[in-house]
Amino acid sequence: MINILILSAGTRDKVVQYFKEALAGKGKVIATDCSPYAPAIYEADEYVLVPRITEPGYLDKILEICREKQITGVLSLIDPELSLLADNKERFLEVGTVPIVPDAKQVDICFHKYAMYEACKALGFATGRCFLDRKEFYHAVENGELTYPVFVKPESGSASLDIHMAQDQETVEFLCGREDGLMIQEFMNGQEYGADVYIDMLSGEVVSIFVKKKLKMRAGETDKAESFQEEKLFALITDFVKKMGFRGIIDIDLFEIDGNWYISEVNPRFGGGYP
């Protein structure tokens, strides 16, 4: 039997349904959430109401569920929980459950945008320039290396929260003066794409890639899109995934500008386009 535990299922009904279809007759899907009003939990074979992720004892409760329900693999649909799974990988393995996330190092890089920028540069993958130091950014502008507008955003975070576009130095100064932990990112003036990539947890080999051309966004997630296929892009994604050492499920944001591909961000989970 293959039993899958989906944490923080929320409103992601289809994700739960897809797992049930794939496991029909082979295992069960168990879902959790902190609210009895989360519709997706009622799509699962079984569900368990749990404390909020921030409450003491949350991890112990999840481990208890894994042990009692003989869970084969566990995954989460929300960002704050991914680090919890990755950081406690050994504890899950001790009860016979595989956390379906990349290793803690890769998860940490994904959640820190400047770290991802540096990783892309080090591995030779094109990406928009990022700056933590305003003086370094202003110097680059003066040298004609990039132009306004630019994005000012938190160096860590998700769901496109607190992202602002700055058209000039005055706006950059104002935004960066309001709070700490911000970075300046080059504006990528091109078509945005999203890639859902599935990587074997053991071998690290890419199992499947699905690319979508983004047509409409909602709170940083894809709302409307159309499928897209290009061998050059698929080869780039496969190379990137292997060199980064990813495992499990990842969602890559990319831009196409004048026929060239740029990697923007990586989310180590199902993309928001999955309802």
Feature annotation, model-predicted:
Residues 214-215, 269-271:
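A short acidic/small-residue loop/turn micro-motif
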Residues 1-100:
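ATP-binding N-terminal substructure of ATP-dependent carboxylate-amine bond-forming enzymes
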Residues 107-189, 201-203, 231, 235:
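Active-site nucleotide/adenylate-binding loops and adjacent lid/helix of ATP-dependent enzymes
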Residues 40-42, 57-60, 108-112, 160-163, ...:
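Short, charged, surface-exposed secondary-structure boundary motifs
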Residues 249-253:
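Flexible, glycine/charged-enriched surface loops at secondary-structure junctions
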Residues 163-240, 244-245, 255-256, 260-262:
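Phosphate-binding site of ATP-dependent enzymes
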Residues 226-227, 270-275:
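ATP-dependent carboxylate-activation loops
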